[in-house]
Amino acid sequence: MNLRKILAFALGPVGAAALGLVTVPVLAWAFSMEDIGRLNVLNVTVSLALLICMLGLDQAYVRHYYETEDKPALLKACLWPGLILLLILAICCAVFAEDISLLMYGEDAGTYFWITLYCVITAFISRFLSLILRMQERGLAYSMSQIIPKLVMLSAVGIIIFTGIAREFLALQLAFLASTSTVLIVYAWNTRKEWQSAFRSKPDSDYTKQLLSFGAPLVFSGVIYWGLMATSTVTLRFYAPLSELGLYSVTASFAAAASIFQSVFSVIWAPTVYKWHAEGADMGKVHAVSKQVLMAVCVICALCGIFSWLTDYLLPEGYSSVKYLILCALIPPLMYTLSEVTCVGIGITKRTGLTIWITLVAFLVNVLLSIKLVPMFGAAGAVVSNATAYVVFFMMRTEVSSLIWRSFPRAKIYFFVTLLLSLTIVTLLSSEYGTYTYVAIWLCFLPLVGIFFRKDAYELLNAVKFSRR
């Protein structure tokens, strides 16, 4: 993938993150902490529903794309099993609509359930259609499909604010539904030829079984990973006030700016590394990429630590602790991104069943720490638990991949990852000593990165120059 295509794919995450950074303060000023906490529950619920109903077939689509001649048949074989499961679960859950709403949002309003269900359906179909654009390397279309729903969400919130519509959770839900519906329409238009061809293709039950054999282990792993990701939300929902969940949600939303890096890299990395493997390329390049990604992770953390105090000027007074929480909240997306490089051997060797045990251990670490820390420290306990669990997750994925595929030097990687976790926790504790303390810490860390990664930076610059040719 050349530089032009990389930039096309980068446009979506960058634009979406920029719009997200605008939307978060607007939501914080316009809606209560409790409603923002409920919006976080909605996001987590949609994620869980997708993980279950996808049956791992979205990953199977990516894995088999370059090895399959009949791509419409591949799309159909991956789409229909999950769609049937989604419809069955929707019918079963509809019987308990009010009870589910009470459990999720603290209010027994059946309307909340139905809107949540519509959000899940639109997100499910959009996920598969987005894979078409991703695998065809249609970066600009893929990016615009990410930016447009963010614009719709921001516009909907603006309408709520300026027209005097009641600023309550129902309005937030409808804004979220409008954004997911918009992206579905955009994806459907951009991939109309592909899904129409898939619709006309003949079903092949044997082929579907083959794909399920690859994806099925990822279902359990995915649900456990959802637990790893959502433990903070769940424990805050039941062990702390909704206001603490709202504080955590805003912090996580700002930290989601790191998802620019995660999203761009993930979109590019999976097709690239599988293409390398299929072409018999030198897979020693994976180690070089891992060091360059680690360098980027360190720089992102340092810059965020230096400038996180700016959140005080963007958010209401009740969110003043966000600047201390945000560094810990950055660790999960960054560790996941780094692990995508170091664990590539698991996917190449098709030993995906191992991911279940890796994720389970990290999930249990998160649960145990969250149960201990969240009741005492609220959002602060949640971000520390989450960050620690993701470091465990990263290290286990790396070690397993090294054992079953190719071994590579890891001491430097582990040293900097441990140092990053320690510094983020120190930043959280420095709230007693003022802003200048943690800013000074990260200012000292940045030159250290330059010293230890100067060779990797040079190699990365050379690679970028080469891609322009």
Regions found by a protein language model. Name each.
Residues 28-36, 99, 136-144, 151-185, ...:
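Membrane-interface helix-loop junctions in multi-pass transport and translocation proteins
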Residues 3, 64-67, 122-145, 331-361, ...:
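Membrane-interface junctions at transmembrane-helix termini in multi-pass inner-membrane proteins
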Residues 2-58, 86-94, 119, 154, ...:
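Signature of the first transmembrane helix
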Residues 427-469:
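Membrane-proximal transmembrane or re-entrant/amphipathic helices at the cytosolic face
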Residues 80-221:
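Hydrophobic transmembrane helix module of multi-pass membrane transport proteins
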Residues 24, 53-69, 135, 251-280, ...:
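Helix-loop junctions and terminal segments of transmembrane helices
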Residues 79-105, 155, 159-162, 185, ...:
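Alpha-helical transmembrane segments of multi-pass membrane transport and lipid-handling proteins
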Residues 2, 166-173, 185-229, 272-284, ...:
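Interhelical loop/hinge segments that connect adjacent transmembrane helices in multipass membrane
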